[in-house]
């Protein structure tokens, strides 16, 4: 008798999880996980004032108990994914965060996350978001971003991810600016 209750409970949990995942991602199809092609793909270019092994790291990142594949970048670094073909109805889905160990440390003033695209002739900035969990508790989580790329459908574009250590017109302050781009992916919305 106990065994049948356990089986029923397991089936209900699996069904509930499947329904949750279906409704959560309904109408969205992932075209390319950018973390999967980082860091060895020939299409990626990394620019930083720090050595590459210090400036960038791909792997699981946990923010407020939620783990996502991510790309850690020190501030004042740039990561370029070259010649990514943008699909019809394409969007960049990404989650921004500053690592938890920076939240309580003194001196941090957050990270400026910038994202844009370029066809090699012109750069279009599509995201400019300051995340400052040390001074803004609402930023102590993954900050979801959905960036419409449909204006570039069918084109091969460079996807350019930048992190800066402070806002414009502020003195540079790289203290505790542990920036993470969480689960960056090109998705198609239906």
Cite the ranges covered by each PLM segment:
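N-terminal Sec-pathway targeting helices
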Residues: 1-12, 19-21
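Gly-Asp-aromatic-enriched flexible segments
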Residues: 17-190
């Amino acid at each position: 008798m106990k065994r049948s209750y356990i089986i029923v409970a397991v089936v209900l949990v699996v069904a509930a999880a499947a329904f949750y995942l279906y409704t959560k991602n309904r109408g969205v199809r992932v075209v390319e996980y950018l973390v999967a092609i980082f860091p060895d793909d020939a299409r990626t270019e990394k620019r930083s004032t720090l050595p590459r092994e210090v400036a960038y790291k791909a792997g699981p990142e946990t923010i407020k108990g939620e783990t996502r594949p991510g790309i850690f970048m020190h501030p004042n670094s740039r990561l370029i994914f070259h010649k990514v073909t943008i699909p019809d109805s394409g969007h960049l889905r990404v989650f921004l965060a500053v690592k938890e160990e920076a939240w309580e440390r003194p001196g941090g003033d957050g990270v400026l996350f910038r994202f844009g695209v370029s066809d090699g002739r012109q750069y279009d900035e599509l995201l400019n978001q300051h995340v400052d969990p040390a001074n803004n508790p609402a930023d102590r989580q993954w900050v979801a971003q959905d960036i419409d790329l449909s204006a570039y459908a069918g084109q091969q574009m460079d996807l350019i991810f930048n992190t800066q250590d402070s806002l414009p017109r502020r003195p540079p302050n790289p203290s505790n600016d542990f920036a993470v781009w969480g689960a960056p992916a090109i998705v198609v919305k239906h």
